């Protein structure tokens, strides 16, 4: 009951703030106002989708009722989080900065409006940016998206900007990190594929009908951005107290069943590029990207491949050299960043999407050997690519393709029991029915 009263009191404050902004009382610096500033039924708090407006106007309602982001703070008090806090010697997870960094909108006090409340979880401004400078004015008929961006709204129509925003928590950055200690305490390992994760969200936005290529461009750009961010994470981790940081490595190279060594596919295939017993660097964020890059910029793809192989050799050594890893990771991150810019402006028509589907599916032997996380990345990407392709071009094999995609996901259901040859076989089956 008290929670509902607090929400209503904050809502009243939000209306006062918005009214002031409409009168031109803009703060000197942008501030975070909280999700209630969007919650009016005439703004984003409606129940029904409105078709005659540029937005659905039920965005807040969708988020607060259906979206897991709205409950990100609340999970910090559940039994799993409580146990994690005990293991990590944290008094309370819902008060710990390392937890609040991603389970709430964690911003400095100076950037919070009086209506701000961190218990709202991962809310509107976590993605769209501090609203104080455009909150009131963006409701006028003459206002445009571009003017909102100029006033401080994050441009989530930009593939790179959207990817960076999501990856801040779904991979980490200089201020947010999930390390091996946190994973051992019970936090899930982090993985991400933009198109799949977006599709899993309750949709609170209108489709971009003016750009039918946007879904594939977003997916492809995000692959490059997440590799860049992974490389920057490696460079940061070389400066840490613990080295190597095991969260940078392939978890399931160690965390798998060891009882049937006579049937071990790992021993059968061998340990290319490393010694047996040396955990390999996690290549899942490169495994799919390499085919995208080769299609957009073949020379850039070759350069990236050379640099990745060099870093893989350093990182997959039992005594990985910190300084060598730092230099190579930074160099390769710059290469990945340049390629991300190219990909973000490239054309992704049905013909290119079809080529990517075939190229990734035919790369099953390589992808499968990079471990379960790489296989999972391929399954998610292939499904997203096919759904985007099917929305623009009909396939006579639609039923068979969807069945083959389902098999890919079945092969990665149990990460510790992952079998590379079986996943490679499933990829070959998919390649045979793709258009």
Task: Pin down the residues of each PLM region.
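Primarily the internal scaffold of c-type cytochrome electron-transfer domains
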Residues: 47-86, 113-122, 126, 130-375
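Bacterial N-terminal signal peptides that target proteins for export
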Residues: 2-15
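Residues immediately within or flanking Cys/His clusters that coordinate Zn2+
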Residues: 33-40, 92, 96-97, 121, ...
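A cross-kingdom marker for long, charged
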Residues: 362-435
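Low-complexity, Gly/Pro
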Residues: 24-27, 34, 44-49, 102-103, ...
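Hydrophobic h-region of N-terminal signal peptides that target proteins for export
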Residues: 14-24
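Local sequence-structure signature of Cys/Sec-based thiol-disulfide redox active-site neighborhoods
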Residues: 27-46, 241-250
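Long, well-ordered hydrophobic secondary-structure segments characteristic of membrane-embedded
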Residues: 79-110
């Amino acid at each position: 009951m008290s929670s509902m009263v607090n929400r209503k009191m904050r809502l009243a404050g939000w209306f006062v703030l918005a009214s002031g902004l409409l009168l031109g009382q803009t703060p000197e610096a942008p501030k975070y106002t909280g999700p209630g500033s969007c919650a009016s039924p005439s703004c984003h708090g409606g129940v029904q989708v409105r078709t005659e407006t540029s937005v659905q106007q039920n965005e807040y309602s969708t988020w607060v009722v259906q979206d897991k982001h709205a409950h990100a703070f609340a999970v910090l008090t559940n039994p799993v989080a409580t146990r994690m806090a005990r293991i990590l010697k944290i008094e309370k997870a819902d008060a710990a900065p390392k937890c609040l960094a991603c389970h709430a909108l964690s911003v400095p006090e100076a950037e919070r409006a009086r209506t701000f409340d961190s218990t709202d979880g991962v809310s509107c401004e976590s993605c769209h940016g501090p609203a104080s400078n455009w909150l009131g004015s963006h409701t006028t008929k003459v206002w445009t998206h571009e003017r909102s961006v100029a006033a401080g709204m994050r441009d989530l129509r930009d593939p790179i900007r959207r990817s960076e925003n999501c990856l801040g928590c779904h991979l980490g950055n200089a201020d947010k990190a999930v390390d091996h200690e946190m994973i051992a305490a019970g936090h899930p390992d982090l993985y991400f594929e933009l198109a799949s994760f977006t599709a899993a969200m309750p949709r609170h936005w209108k489709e971009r009908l003016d750009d039918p290529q946007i879904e594939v461009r977003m997916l492809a750009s995000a692959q490059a951005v997440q590799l860049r961010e992974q490389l920057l994470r490696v460079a940061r981790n070389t400066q840490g107290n613990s080295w190597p940081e095991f969260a940078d490595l392939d978890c399931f190279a160690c965390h798998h069943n060891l009882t049937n060594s006579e049937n071990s596919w790992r021993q059968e295939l061998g340990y290319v590029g490393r010694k047996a017993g040396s955990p390999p660097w996690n290549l899942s964020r490169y495994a799919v990207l390499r085919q995208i890059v080769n299609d957009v910029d073949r020379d850039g793809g070759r350069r990236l491949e050379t640099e990745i192989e060099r870093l893989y050799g350093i990182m997959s050594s039992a005594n990985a050299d910190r300084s060598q890893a730092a230099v190579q990771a930074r160099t390769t991150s710059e290469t990945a960043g340049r390629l991300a810019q190219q990909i973000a402006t490239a054309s992704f028509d049905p013909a290119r999407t079809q080529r990517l589907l075939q190229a990734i599916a035919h790369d099953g032997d390589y992808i499968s050997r990079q471990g379960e996380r790489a296989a999972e990345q391929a399954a998610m990407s292939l499904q997203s690519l096919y759904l985007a392709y099917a929305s623009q071009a009909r396939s006579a094999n639609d039923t068979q393709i969807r069945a083959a995609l389902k098999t890919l996901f079945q092969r990665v259901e149990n990460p510790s029991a992952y079998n590379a040859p079986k996943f490679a076989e499933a990829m070959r089956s998919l390649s045979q029915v793709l258009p």
